[in-house]
């Protein structure tokens, strides 16, 4: 009886690990692209039913490469984990924060407002909160081989592309693509900015 119970417990644990690998980013523990697409589809369907706007925001760190080049990927990973933590603390439990890979993050907001202008204002307020939080200094502990642990201060801003969605014919991939394009517009304008997409979603 004890052996059977242990086998079942181990099987449940194994299944949970497989599920986590399939749907979550191993570094930040955030939903990955696969789970993001599912959550976005759900948010889009809910928006269509309720008549309330939703929003998707695409974040890209502006000066992440310099940290990786100077201190290595392990230190870059520390920054990414802290970025995930900061974004999570700016959103509601019903919202989804995901990591697409590299230094790219996405947030899906649902149930904003029936009015487009009010929804854009709500989304802008949260986006600005996240932008400001991500721009605060990062204190990262590093230890190179054979040397004592030290703490470095790194400054990192973000470029943010946003798109509102409601009753529409666009796919989840279209929504992500439009937000991505808006993010590049923000980056080309100097970074540390929020840019809304003009695409109709």
Residue ranges and their predicted role:
Residues 1-7:
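PAS-family sensory domains
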Residues 19-23, 29-55, 62-92, 98-102, ...:
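Conserved long alpha-helical elements within nucleotide-processing catalytic cores of c-di-GMP signaling
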Residues 97, 143-153, 159-189, 195-201:
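Cyclic nucleotide signaling catalytic output domains
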Residues 99, 117-119, 123, 134-158:
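Catalytic core regions of nucleotide second-messenger enzymes
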């Amino acid at each position: 009886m004890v052996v059977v119970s242990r086998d079942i417990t181990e099987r449940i644990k194994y299944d949970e690990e497989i599920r986590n690998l399939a749907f979550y980013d191993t570094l930040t523990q955030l939903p990955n692209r696969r789970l993001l697409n599912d959550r976005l589809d759900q948010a889009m369907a809910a928006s269509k039913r309720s008549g309330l706007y939703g929003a998707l925001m695409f974040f890209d760190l502006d000066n992440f490469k310099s940290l990786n080049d100077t201190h290595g990927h392990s230190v870059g990973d520390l920054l990414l984990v802290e970025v995930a933590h900061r974004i999570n603390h700016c959103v509601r439990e019903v919202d989804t924060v995901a990591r697409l890979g590299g230094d790219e993050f996405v947030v899906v907001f649902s149930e904003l407002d029936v009015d487009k202008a009010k929804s854009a204002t709500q989304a802008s307020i949260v986006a600005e909160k996240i932008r400001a939080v991500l721009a605060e200094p990062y204190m990262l502990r590093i230890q190179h081989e054979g040397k004592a642990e030290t703490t470095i201060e790194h400054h990192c801003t973000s470029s943010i592309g946003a798109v509102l969605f409601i009753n529409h014919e666009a796919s989840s991939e279209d929504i992500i693509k439009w937000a991505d394009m808006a993010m590049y517009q923000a980056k080309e304008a100097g970074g540390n900015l929020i840019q809304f997409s003009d695409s109709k979603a």
